[in-house]
Each structure stands twice: as structure tokens, then as C-alpha cells.
Amino acid sequence: MAKKTYDLLFKLLLIGDSGVGKTCVLFRFSDDAFNTTFISTIGIDLKIKTVELQGKKIKLQIWDTAGQERFHTITTSYYRGAMGIMLVYDITNAKSFENISKWLRNIDEHANEDVERMLLGNKCDMEDKRVVPKAKGEQIAREHGIRFFETSAKANINIEKAFLTLAEDILRKTPVKEPNSENVDISSGGGVTGWKSKCC
């Protein structure tokens, strides 16, 4: 049997309205890349990145979920087993911020009770087009007792910090145990891609 290359496996979800930049956030973290030509994610996409925290190698299994209404029935099954959820809105799109409460209800209905949540106000490099004040993001995060960052995949602002903070929060309340399996359940997902990369 092959030796495991990690100590813990954390399943993370990126959720939020279509077009808020979830895929760009994921690619910036996983591959330090930014591409303006992404098409909307169809169903689910998966990326894997291994990071080291507190002397532990942690495999982050990050699911990028479709934001369109018609895909909500697909994505609900992916809340199960998620240990961390990043809820993303676009600071230049008021509707994406207004829908935060709906996404938070989805988390309450479908995710584990103890899931770590984080709110990201994305595209903070587009200050001239901002319609959602930072204070509003901070307020809703406070009300729900969750962490908040403003991020930019394009300018690489707070992307790594957000992922590592979420992983640290999960690690703090995770009992140390051996990872169950190398297998990834993709039985009900859409297009899935994956790679492994190591953080130095």
C-alpha cells in the first residue's frame, strides 16, 4: 500500500452567486494564476492542494460549485462532509451581496452543524466600481459569527491568507487521526479536474 503523503484531509467548498469569481479565487490559490476567460462552472470542479500547518501536512480538497439557480439541487449534496465553506460575493454586484442570507440558509440546511464558514468580498481591486461597502461585509460576518476578508484574485489580495486561515480554524477543532482514504467521491459531480501541489 502506498504511503500517505498527508496527515489530514479537509473538504472545502466555494459557494456564491455565478460570476462572483469563485473559480478565479480557487485558481489563484492553487496555481497562483489568474485568467479572465473562465466560463461558468458547470456542476462541480475539484482542485487539490497540500499545505503545511502546525507541522501537519494537510490536503485541501476544494470544491468549486456552480452558482446558477438551476444547479442548486446538484450542489446541495456537496455540502455533506464539508469542513469549511467560503461564501463569496462580488463587491461590484449588490445582488450577489443581497443573496448572502440565502446562501447562509443553504449552509444551515445542508451542511454539518460545526462547519467553519468564511465570507469573502471578492474583486476588491475594482474600487472604482464598488457598490458594497466593506463595512457591510464586516457587519453581516459579525452577525453570523464568521470570519471576513476582502479579496482579489486578479491582484492576489488575501487569497492565500483566507484559505490558510480557514484551514487553521478547522485544524484547531479537528481531532488528530489518520486520513481515511485517498479516494475522492466524484459519483454525483460534473466535470472534475485535480492536481497535487506542495507548499513550501
UniProtKB/Swiss-Prot annotation:
> In which residues does the motif Switch 1 occur?
32-46
The molecule here is called Ras-related protein Rab-10
Record-annotated residues binding GTP?
Answer: 18-24, 35-36, 40-41, 67, 122-123, 125-126, 152-154
Which PANTHER family does the record match to this protein?
A: LD44762P
What residue ranges carry the coiled-coil annotation? none
Q: Where do transmembrane segments lie in this chain?
A: none
Outline what the protein does: The small GTPases Rab are key regulators of intracellular membrane trafficking, from the formation of transport vesicles to their fusion with membranes. Rabs cycle between an inactive GDP-bound form and an active GTP-bound form that is able to recruit to membranes different set of downstream effectors directly responsible for vesicle formation, movement, tethering and fusion. That Rab is mainly involved in the biosynthetic transport of proteins from the Golgi to the plasma membrane.
Cofactor(s) the protein needs: Mg(2+)
